[in-house]
């Protein structure tokens, strides 16, 4: 190949290159390392905040549960003991009920002092129970409430509304807002329907 031929080839290559269209590649922005780091920090902060809120909620629930358990232990911790003591209160009441009213009125000084001593003992016992949240209630004259009373029998009595407690065989007791022992009662049968009751009866030391 002569020099002239080589020059021709170079000229042809140059012309062909000029005729070919130029294809440019799209420009891709490089990732900003600082921006990615900021996003990661935001996610970590959100996760940490979420964990902190959950932990605070769990701690608050634990605090409330602990307070309730402590309060229940304080209120109901004497339940078993109080239930055993109720037998003593019942026996004192039976002893007083066994003495008729006329016998009390005409009792000799010795017997009268004995009766007064039993009454004083019963009052002291009920006061001690009440200081520990245990209260006696007598629902006589109120509408029967199965949440506080246990019906032992029915008494035909059209003079009072049906469902009225007309006799109390055994007084009931509550401890806190729970029934320690329901009252054993006799309920009237017949008469008009009794009005709604608001609970188990008046609470307190009822002699």
UniProtKB/Swiss-Prot annotation:
Residues 1-40 are annotated as: Disordered. Residues 1-11 have a biased composition (Basic and acidic residues). One of its GO terms (biological process) is protein folding. One of its GO terms (cellular component) is cytoplasm. Keywords: Chaperone, Cytoplasm, Stress response. InterPro entries: GrpE, GrpE_coiled_coil, GrpE_head. Participates actively in the response to hyperosmotic and heat shock by preventing the aggregation of stress-denatured proteins, in association with DnaK and GrpE. It is the nucleotide exchange factor for DnaK and may function as a thermosensor. Unfolded proteins bind initially to DnaJ; upon interaction with the DnaJ-bound protein, DnaK hydrolyzes its bound ATP, resulting in the formation of a stable complex. GrpE releases ADP from DnaK; ATP binding to DnaK triggers the release of the substrate protein, thus completing the reaction cycle. Belongs to the GrpE family. This is Protein GrpE. It comes from Rhodopseudomonas palustris (strain ATCC BAA-98 / CGA009). The lineage of its organism: Bacteria, Pseudomonadati, Pseudomonadota, Alphaproteobacteria, Hyphomicrobiales.
């Amino acid at each position: 190949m002569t020099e002239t031929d080589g020059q021709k080839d170079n000229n042809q290559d140059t012309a062909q290159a000029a005729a070919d269209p130029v294809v440019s590649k799209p420009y891709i922005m490089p990732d900003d390392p600082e921006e990615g780091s900021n996003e990661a920090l935001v996610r970590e902060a959100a996760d940490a905040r979420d964990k902190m809120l959950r932990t605070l909620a769990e701690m608050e629930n634990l605090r409330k549960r602990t307070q309730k358990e402590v309060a229940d232990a304080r209120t109901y911790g004497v339940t078993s003991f109080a239930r055993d003591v109720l037998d003593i209160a019942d026996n004192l009441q039976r002893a007083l009920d066994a003495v008729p009213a006329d016998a009390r009125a005409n009792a000799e000084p010795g017997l009268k002092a004995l009766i007064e001593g039993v009454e004083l003992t019963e009052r002291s016992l009920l006061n001690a129970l009440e200081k520990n949240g245990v209260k006696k209630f007598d629902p006589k004259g109120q509408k029967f409430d199965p949440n506080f009373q246990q019906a032992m029998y029915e008494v035909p009595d059209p003079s009072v509304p049906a469902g009225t407690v007309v006799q109390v065989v055994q007084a009931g007791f509550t401890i806190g807002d729970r029934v320690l022992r329901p009252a054993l009662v006799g309920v009237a049968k017949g008469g008009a329907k009794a009005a709604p009751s608001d609970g188990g009866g008046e609470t307190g030391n009822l002699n």
